[in-house]
Curated annotation (Swiss-Prot):
Source species of the chain: Ceratodon purpureus (Fire moss)
Protein's name according to its UniProt entry: Acyl-lipid (9-3)-desaturase
Domain Cytochrome b5 heme-binding: 97-171
Subcellular location: Membrane
Domain notes: The histidine box domains may contain the active site and/or be involved in metal ion binding.
Motif Histidine box-2 boundaries: 286-290
């Protein structure tokens, strides 16, 4: 059980099922392979689209289903061949494990020569990185210990594929950080306590609430045609879009159903059809954010696209220092004044980039049909509601207000979670990276509902597949872990979070003013 003080009252990580060993047992893995082939065949081409459509700068989806599909089925020849015949298998050739130090592994951090560490074992993924179903997000952990990010985002069947790239064992000069050990023990404890299991009735209730919101919005303009009614209906539609955004987020993190392909199906319905954004585009962007929140490279070029907002917004003085244009500096001097207004255009930006994603020539015909077809259904129902029920220019007013309202409601919650927190260009372990870059907003009936559970953003980043209704249960244990290891657990009111975001923007704006004067 979980102790009140946030520690472990019994058991440890060693007492749990070893998923790595389980996944490599022939009987179990064969069963999982057959099951995955039967239930999830449809999503493989979409999974591999994520990999092909990423660049070295912008990494891709590290979603659980992508890893599961790559292990469970082998219809893609280049993947199966590379897994079957990896270049390096030193442990087989030498008949005994080779040992490596952290320094040895760190020297192999290039796309053509890349090693990673997972559970004290070293893997040479040089021949696999380009074919990684999750895309180039794997690049962010070249030469590093990827134990926690791998365990957090991958299905148990993904352990099987690792065995083909095993080249030896890690020998540490120093022991693993106690922080990481205790984080792993907490994760094992939460697994035993069934906290990764979702309440289907909870999600049914959330769905019904959303249906009632959209039904009310449509009913208002069905009965009344005044501009007051149009504005009220549009505002409710914006709220509906925001709340459906949280639902799609839950499904696409595989929080709801135990079967990953079913989460994906519902995620596509809510994401593409209801909301009109490309799920593939979103995963490409969002899962990299989870792997490298607020992280930049050595030159302070953002790795996390969520902070790649120049030339309009600069989230730190280090990012500001990369700006050379005097015109940009003049704009940035006022970023704290126009920022909240800018949030209203967030959804329009996401719709634009989603549409642009579907035009990429790398997409196969099937991928184009899936993305464009489901997104087209969104525009059909959304425009039909507006133009069928409203006369004159009122449909345009209704749609514009809906988009602006939903953009603000979504964007406002997002910026509270990470903006105004540390932006860094140094290597951090998984746990330190999540906590340093993330802020919680205090729990409460309204906050929990309005933010879709993302007010517990620290907990979500540490355990992204945990259903939102369990995040408040684990927050005392996460806070205890942070305090024990001297980490700042930022848990503030919504007003305080807003103030901290705006203060950061103002501080950077002042620095932009000084920088512009110095350049004159």
């Amino acid at each position: 059980m979980v102790s009140q003080g946030g520690g472990l009252s019994q058991g440890s990580i060693e007492e749990n099922i070893d998923v790595e060993h389980l996944a490599t047992m022939p009987l179990v893995s064969d069963f999982l392979n057959v099951l995955g082939t039967t239930l999830g065949q449809w999503s493989l081409s979409t999974t591999f689209a994520f990999k092909r459509l990423t660049t070295k700068k912008h990494s891709s989806d590290i979603s659980v289903e992508a890893q599961k599909e790559s292990v469970a089925r082998g219809p893609v020849e280049n993947i199966s061949q590379s897994v079957a015949q990896p270049i390096r298998r030193r442990w087989v050739q030498d008949k005994k494990p080779v040992t490596y130090s952290l320094k040895d592994v760190a020297s192999h951090d290039m796309p053509q020569d890349c090693w990673i560490i997972i559970k004290e074992k070293v893997y040479d993924v040089s021949t696999f990185a380009e074919q990684h179903p999750g895309g180039t997000v794997i690049n962010t952990y070249f030469g590093r210990d990827a134990t926690d990010v791998f365990s957090t985002f991958h299905a148990s069947t993904s352990w099987k594929i690792l065995q083909n790239f095993y080249i030896g064992n890690l020998v540490r000069e120093e022991p693993t950080l106690e922080l990481l050990k205790e984080y792993r023990e907490l994760r094992a404890l939460f697994l035993r306590e069934q906290l990764f299991k979702s309440s289907k009735s909870y999600y049914l209730f959330k769905t019904l609430i959303n249906v009632s919101i959209v039904a009310t919005s449509i009913a208002i303009i069905s009965l009344y045609k005044s501009y007051r009614a149009v504005l009220l209906s549009a505002s409710l539609m914006g709220l509906f879009i925001q709340q459906c955004g949280w639902l799609s987020h839950d499904f696409l993190h595989h929080q709801v159903f135990e079967t990953r392909w079913l989460n994906d199906v519902v995620g596509y319905v809510v994401g593409n059809v209801v909301l009109g954004f490309s799920v593939s585009w979103w995963k490409t962007k969002h899962n990299l954010h989870h792997a490298a929140p607020n992280e930049c490279d050595q030159k302070y070029t953002p790795i996390d696209e969520d902070i790649d907002t120049l030339p309009i917004i600069a989230w730190s003085k280090d990012l500001l220092a990369t700006v050379e244009s005097k015109t940009m500096l003049r704009v940035l001097q006022y970023q704290h004044l126009f920022f909240l207004v800018l949030l209203t255009f967030a959804r329009a930006s996401w719709l634009f980039w989603s549409a642009a994603f579907t035009l990429r020539p790398e997409l196969t015909l099937g991928e184009k049909l899936l993305e464009r077809g489901t997104m087209a259904l969104h525009y059909i129902w959304f425009n039909s509601v507006a133009f069928y029920l409203l006369p004159g220019w009122k449909p345009v007013v209704w749609m514009v207000v809906s988009e602006l309202m939903s953009g603000f409601l979504l964007g406002y919650v997002f910026v509270l979670s990470h903006n105004g927190m540390e932006v860094y260009n140094t290597s951090k372990d998984f746990v330190n990276a999540q906590i340093a870059s993330t802020r919680d907003i205090k729990a409460g009936v309204f906050n929990d509902w309005f933010t879709g559970g993302l007010n517990r953003q620290i907990e979500h980043h540490l355990f992204p597949t945990m259903p939102r209704h369990n995040l408040n249960k684990i927050s005392p244990h996460v806070e205890t872990l942070c305090k024990k290891h001297g980490l700042v657990y930022e848990d503030v009111s919504m007003a305080s979070g807003t103030y901290r975001v705006l203060k950061t923007l103002k501080d950077v704006a002042d620095a932009a003013s000084h920088q512009q004067l110095a350049a004159s």
